[in-house]
Curated annotation (Swiss-Prot):
Cell location: Cell membrane; Bud neck; Bud tip
Protein name as it appears in the record: Bud site selection protein RAX1
Membrane-crossing segments per the record: 298-318, 326-346, 410-430
Species of the source: Saccharomyces cerevisiae (strain ATCC 204508 / S288c)
GO cellular component, one term: cellular bud neck
Phosphoserine found at: 167
GO biological process: axial cellular bud site selection; bipolar cellular bud site selection; protein localization
Length: 435
């Protein structure tokens, strides 16, 4: 009960904090934030920068490896705790396994309180005692394992074999150190070995750090989390200092966005994996307001200003009354609105309704994802489809971002009113002269 109350209190405190400031990078990476400052939007934003997206890919894959290691540790810990009870219900094979585990614990090769030491994969640095070797031989015989198997006296491999046989009995999948090693090797091959081998190769990594990690994983066959700590810190610093501020300035200060270009789809040999990752965030539209929304608004605004100037000069040189010349307020309002919104990349109406355009990129082989678009626009008014397309719009769920964009929208409204008033007064108050 106390834990549930603590979680509820923590969630309430987090929601209050999110109303007072923009999120941090860590909050985005652990997926605690909402649109438009969520992890997927951050991923889409980085896809337009060569090699920057690789660091976020590495972070996500490293977190997957970390969760895999933690799950393995938790499974080992629970197995060591529950095994004495299971031993009473099973046969001789379970007895031999129980005796072997007890001997490993007594001689210090295995610590139930710290099973994470298995991740260090230290190998047979500490030799087994004759008693332990005898128990190991009995366990192999009872389990039907050849005497040549597990000859390296590797505790991690022994625990793997025990857990593997337990999983066959209870039908539950188990994580093994082979899976952990395969995951660590995959990280090295994908991000550290060579740019020719992988397009997600991490550049600008110190050679000392790179070589040390490769040697630890591929030669020493280690897979614990601490091996990647230095690279993890470098990745976080790069994302926090170079990438995240640009991301916040893009999505938290603006609610209209031009279509971005994913550089990976313009290179030779694009992989299917990357195509699948970007599916659902691709966008194909013939509307210039959807593809190039800022420049389209500015161009449309200049057109309306030109119309306003033309109407104003015609009415002046035809000596129409000042009351009639006030009609120039309409084209001047539309022109100033479009130009100000395009220059500041803040649509005033969008800010009032609390919506923003999603970051989208065009893929030359992709089509629209109708299902994703419809699910994201259920709460977006149809009237907002005039500029930019309704499918690109999504509701701003982060409270501080919504408040910030509303303030910027108010500032843009003041600029529009001021500019419109100035043009209207000038063309309405100057003396008319018929030519």
């Amino acid at each position: 009960m106390k834990e549930e109350l603590s979680k509820v209190s923590s969630m309430q405190n987090f929601e209050m904090i999110q109303r007072e400031r923009l999120p941090t990078l860590y909050e985005v990476l652990i997926q605690r934030t909402s649109q438009p400052v969520d992890l997927w939007t951050f991923y889409t934003f980085l896809s337009q920068f060569p090699y920057a997206i690789n660091y976020l890919d590495f972070w996500v894959d490293l977190m997957t490896h970390t969760r895999l290691c933690k799950n393995y540790i938790e499974l080992v810990r629970k197995s060591l705790i529950n095994f004495p009870q299971e031993q009473q219900q099973n046969g001789s094979t379970s007895t031999a396994t129980f005796d072997l585990l007890n001997a490993l614990i007594e001689e210090g090769h295995l610590d139930p309180e710290a099973p994470d030491k298995l991740l260090e994969n230290s190998g047979p640095d500490v030799p087994f005692s004759p008693k332990l070797n005898e128990l190991l031989g009995d366990w192999k015989h009872q389990s039907g394992i050849g005497q040549e198997a597990l000859r390296n006296e590797d505790v991690a491999l022994i625990v793997d074999e025990i857990m593997k046989r337990r999983s066959q009995q209870d039908g539950k999948p188990q994580i093994t150190t082979k899976q952990l090693l395969h995951s660590a090797v995959g990280l090295c091959n994908t991000y550290l070995v060579s740019p020719e081998q992988s397009e997600r190769y991490l550049s600008n990594i110190p050679m000392e750090t790179r070589n040390r990690i490769i040697e630890s994983v591929q030669i020493e066959r280690k897979y614990d989390i601490e091996i990647f700590d230095d690279l993890k810190n470098l990745t976080y610093q790069f994302l926090e200092m170079d990438c995240f501020p640009k991301f916040l300035s893009r999505v938290a200060l603006h609610n209209i966005h031009d279509e971005i270009s994913d550089w990976r789809f313009h290179s030779v040999g694009v992989t299917n994996e990357k195509s699948n990752r970007s599916r659902g965030q691709t966008h194909i539209s013939r509307s210039p307001f959807s593809n190039h929304t800022s420049i389209s608004r500015i161009g449309f605004g200049l057109l309306w200003l030109g119309i306003g100037f033309w109407i104003g000069y015609v009415l002046i040189f035809l000596a129409y009354s000042r009351a009639i010349r006030v009609v120039t307020v309409v084209p001047f309002t539309l022109g100033c609105y479009c130009i100000v919104c395009g220059m500041y990349q803040v649509d005033i109406v969008y800010s009032w309704f609390g919506v923003t355009q999603r970051l989208l990129h065009r893929h030359k082989n992709a089509g629209n994802d109708e299902g994703d678009a419809s699910s994201d626009t259920d709460h977006v008014p149809m009237i907002l489809a005039v500029f930019g397309g309704r499918r690109r719009l999504t509701r701003i769920e982060h409270p501080f971002t919504r408040q910030l964009l509303r303030k910027r929208g108010l500032w843009c409204l003041l600029l529009v009113v001021g500019a419109t008033a100035a043009f209207t007064v000038i063309f309405s108050c100057v003396p008319g002269r018929r030519v």
